[in-house]
């Protein structure tokens, strides 16, 4: 996957741009990022916000080593499939965005 494909996948699956990074938010605080992807020139970095407010790197991978899952399209190589609760957080973010579009919010 390249930067454009990863961005398209993320935006279609609940991620949103916050402060220049693709981000997932808490359901209770939809403007505050708790997971972010930093798309750099040759690598993508996934960071998780700790309760103290500091960002901790969870994964980093070169674009050339990212492969989209054949069934879900989810990029393999960043650990999304093994991070507990990640899929649910992504689904909550996507559902909130869809509902906001339906209600005009």
Predicted ranges, named:
Residues 1-2, 28-34, 39-105:
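Intrinsically disordered, low-complexity regulatory regions enriched in serine/threonine/proline
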Residues 1-17:
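Amphipathic alpha-helical segments
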Residues 18-25:
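Short, hydrophobic/aromatic-rich segments at coil-to-beta transitions
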């Amino acid at each position: 996957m390249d930067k454009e494909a990863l961005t398209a996948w993320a935006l279609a699956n609940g991620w949103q741009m916050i402060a220049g990074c693709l981000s997932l938010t808490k359901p209770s605080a939809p403007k505050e990022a708790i997971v972010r992807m930093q798309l750099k020139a040759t690598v993508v970095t996934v960071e998780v916000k700790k309760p103290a407010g500091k960002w901790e790197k969870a994964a980093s991978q070169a674009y050339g080593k990212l492969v989209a899952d054949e069934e879900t399209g989810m990029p393999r190589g960043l650990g999304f499939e093994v991070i507990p609760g990640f899929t649910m957080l992504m689904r909550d973010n996507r559902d909130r965005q869809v509902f906001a579009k339906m209600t005009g919010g």
